Amino acid sequence: MKGISRMSIREVSEVLNTEPSEEFLKACAQDERLGIQNLIVRYYKEWEARLVEAERIEALLREEKQLWLNGYLHIAGIDEAGRGPLAGPVVAATCILPAKFNLPGLNDSKKLTESKREKLFQQIKEQAIGYAVGSAEPAEIDGLNILQATKLAMKRAVEGLKVRPHFLLIDALELPSLKIPQKGIIDGDALSASIAAASILAKVSRDHLMGELDKLYPEYGFAKNKGYGTREHLMALRRHGVSPIHRRSFAPVQQQLDIV
C-alpha cells in the first residue's frame, strides 16, 4: 500500500471501510488534510457505536448464557403480538438463536421502526436455528378470553418448531400445558435476545397478515391500523358494522353488536 500522503481521500475512505491497521489509523490521525481528519473522526465514532451495540447484545444474552452453561442447548424465546386489537388473530412466535449471530439493532419490536423490523425479520429467519409462528383466531379469543388465546397461540408456535427446544423463555407468561423447562420474564422482549427475536417475528408476521385481511375488508383500514381501535377504525365499525374477523367479546365491538 502506498503512503497515506500519496492517497486520495476516497482511497483512504475505502481502506477505513475494511479493517485498517493501527499503523494506518495513526497515519490518518497525523495527516493534516481536513477531509482525512473528518474521516478518522467518523471512523472512531462508528467504532465506538459498534462497541456499545456489542455490549448491549451481550447483555441481552445474559439469560441464554446462563442456560447454556446449565446444559440447555436449544433455548426458545417466545412472544406475541396483537393482544389489544379489536380485530384479527393474536399471533405468537418462537425463535431459537445460535450462540453466535449478527443481528445489529435487535430489540423489543415496539422500539423499532417498521423498516428496521422488516430487515431484522429476514435476518432472524436466515440465522435462527429454528423458528415458528402460531396464532389464535378471533372466535377462539372470544371463546377462551385473550389471555388463554395468547397461551394457545404460543403453544402452537412451540409445537410448530422443527427443532426440539430444551428450555423456553417466555415474555411475561408461563405455559404449564407444555412439559418443557421454562421461565416467564416480565419485559422479556427488552431483556432477552431470544424473546426480542420472537417479538419481531410475531409482530411482522401479524402485520403482514393484517395487510392481507385489509384486501378482504378494505373498509376498516386494517393495513394501517392493524386491527387496533383507532378513531378511523371505530368510525368504520359504526358505518359498516362488525366483520367476521372482529373480536366480538371486546367492548367496542360488543357495543356495536348491541346497537344492531
From Swiss-Prot:
UniProt keywords, alphabetically: Cytoplasm, Endonuclease, Hydrolase, Manganese, Metal-binding, Nuclease
Record carries keyword Lipid metabolism: no
Pfam families xrefs: RNase_HII
Residues of the RNase H type-2 domain: 73-260
SUPFAM superfamilies in alphabetical order: Ribonuclease H-like
Classification via Gene3D superfamilies: Ribonuclease H-like superfamily/Ribonuclease H
UniProt family annotation: Belongs to the RNase HII family.
TM region(s), chain numbering: none
Intracellular or extracellular location(s): Cytoplasm
GO molecular function: manganese ion binding; RNA binding; RNA-DNA hybrid ribonuclease activity
Protein name in the entry: Ribonuclease HII
GO cellular component: cytoplasm; ribonuclease H2 complex
